[in-house]
Amino acid sequence: MTLEQFFMENPRAALAFSGGVDSAYLLWAGVQAGAEVRPYFIKTPFQPQFEQEDARRLCEQLNVELTVIPLDIFTAPEVVANPMDRCYHCKKRLFFLLRGRAASDGFTLLLDGTNASDDAGDRPGMRALRELEVRSPLRECGLTKERIRELSRQAGLFTWDKPSYACLATRVPAGRPITRDDLEKAERGERVLSGLGFRDFRVRLTQNGCKLQVTEDQISLALDRRVDILDILTPLFPEITLDLRPRAVSD
């Protein structure tokens, strides 16, 4: 099955839209197929501001209206406790809310941007999607992340080379309760460090501070900019370390 065939069979759908590579291409494909695809962005403290800005920018490029739904995820104790299956509880909250809003707008089909490169396995987040009957056209059509990037480039989407970005909650070690302060520190640190030229990196919280993880090609940059990194992160964290084991590229 191709995406065009999928949207011919399913001409109306709500889309969980993050503004990332996958959901951006899925929205573009729906628009190109003449389908009515309504993108919904659920704004929680787990997402940095630039994600919403990218989502709006992409929708403006495609001349599609974006619906933003605010959610204070800190009202969900099963999420902020940060258990190993946090992602399951979080996605279930998000998609339950989204399904209700989409239904009130007249949409019975809910889509997300999971692709064929994502390992479904027993990942907690995938379980939530199955339970709530969320369909993943990119995965169903066999489109891998690499292929989606290439098709996005051909389509002229600015998201084609956007690094994958996991939610800010992943910066907090499992078992450590998530706080707004921790998320704000991680987001601020990553936002400022990106201005130094870092891409596809993480500022992860540790017991006494933070650990900077970069890809192999950026380790030398991290060492060269050590003083700048300390200037940026010292006001936020008492202890700062650099992981000398290179971070795997997101894709």
Task: Specify the residue positions occupied by each region the protein language model found.
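Short, aliphatic-rich beta-strand segments
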Residues: 203-216
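Flexible, glycine/charged-enriched surface loops at secondary-structure junctions
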Residues: 199-204, 239-243
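Short proline/glycine- and acidic-rich turn/helix-capping motifs at secondary-structure junctions
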Residues: 241-251
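Short, conserved charged micro-motifs
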Residues: 218-225
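Mid-to-C-terminal catalytic subdomains of enzymes
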Residues: 139-145, 149-193, 197-202
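ATP-dependent adenylation/nucleotidyltransferase module used to activate substrates
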Residues: 1-154, 195, 210, 228-237, ...
